[in-house]
Structure formats: structure tokens, C-alpha cells
């Protein structure tokens, strides 16, 4: 996409700058990704007068969003396409390759059934790349990963249901 800080402004690599300064200060760099939600999230902007109108094209600031009946449903349709999920996977790998964040936070919707195989491939890639750099941690929501294999995000101070004690 051309919608990035280097091309659209402020014409520099903000994440790269953060990496340099974090290392200089002895801090750990973390990153977050909310991209998988682009499958449907910006589609709601078409429900009222906004700047998110069809036709959108690949390379626009967001993926051409699909209508989503129920974004909490793990099997909701339309399912993300292989093209979309491959794009998501490559963008996540680019974050790892360029910035080597020790912590990577994913917001919800990575637990969708269509995302699971791509998420597994990403986690294997991330853990393998970062092993020689001292390891890494994935933060996730809901049941995107088996309990104990990453750091679950706990919002509002508690889980919605009981979880095993480790």
C-alpha cells in the first residue's frame, strides 16, 4: 500500500525510529497488528456518509472491506480469502523482519476459524526468527492460541469465563 508513513507523511520510518530509540534506552520494542480486522471492519464505514466508499482497490489504505454479519462469530461468512490472509501473513512477517519486536500484540478476530492456519504459520515463523534474538511473546485475545502458549489479553480486569491455573 502507498498509505504508509514513508510515502504519505511524515516521510520517515516511524517504527524504525522507535526501534533505534528503544534500543538506545535499553527498552524492549513491541508492536501491534489489527490488520486482520480489515476484512470487514471498514465495511461499516459504507453504512453512512463517510470517506470509505466502494470501489476500493488493493493498495488503498485498507483492504476492500466485506460485509460482516456477525464479527463475534468464529465461522462467520464471508470467510476471508486466501489472498487476504496471505497478505495479512506477509505483512506480519514484514514487521518481524524489519523491526524484530520482542512483543507482538494481536487484537481480536485472529481467532476466526479461517485465520487459524495462517496464525499458526506466523507464530512458527516469529518464534523461529526471534529465537536467536532472545525470544519473543505473542499477546492475543480470546482463544486464538491454546492457553499457556502466549500471553492472553485480559481486558476489564478478568476473563469472561474460568481458565485453568498454570
Identify the function of each model-found stretch.
Residues 1-166:
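Mature catalytic domains of secreted/periplasmic carbohydrate-active enzymes
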Amino acid at each position: 500500500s502507498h498509505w504508509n508513513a514513508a510515502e504519505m507523511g511524515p516521510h520517515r520510518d516511524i517504527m524504525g525510529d522507535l526501534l533505534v530509540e528503544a534500543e538506545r534506552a535499553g527498552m524492549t520494542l513491541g508492536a501491534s497488528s489489527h490488520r486482520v480486522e480489515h476484512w470487514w471492519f471498514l465495511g461499516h464505514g459504507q453504512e453512512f456518509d463517510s470517506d470509505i466508499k466502494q470501489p476500493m482497490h488493493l493498495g488503498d489504505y485498507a483492504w476492500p472491506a466485506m460485509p460482516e454479519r456477525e464479527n463475534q462469530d468464529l465461522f462467520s461468512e464471508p470467510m476471508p480469502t486466501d489472498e487476504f490472509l496471505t497478505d495479512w501473513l506477509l505483512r506480519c512477517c514484514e514487521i518481524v523482519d524489519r523491526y524484530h519486536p520482542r512483543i507482538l500484540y494481536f487484537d481480536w478476530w485472529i481467532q476466526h476459524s479461517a485465520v487459524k492456519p495462517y496464525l499458526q504459520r506466523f507464530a512458527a515463523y516469529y518464534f523461529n526468527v526471534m529465537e536467536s534474538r532472545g525470544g519473543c511473546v505473542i499477546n492475543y485475545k480470546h482463544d486464538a492460541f491454546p492457553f499457556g502458549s502466549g500471553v492472553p489479553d485480559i481486558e476489564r480486569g478478568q476473563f469472561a469465563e474460568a481458565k485453568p491455573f498454570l
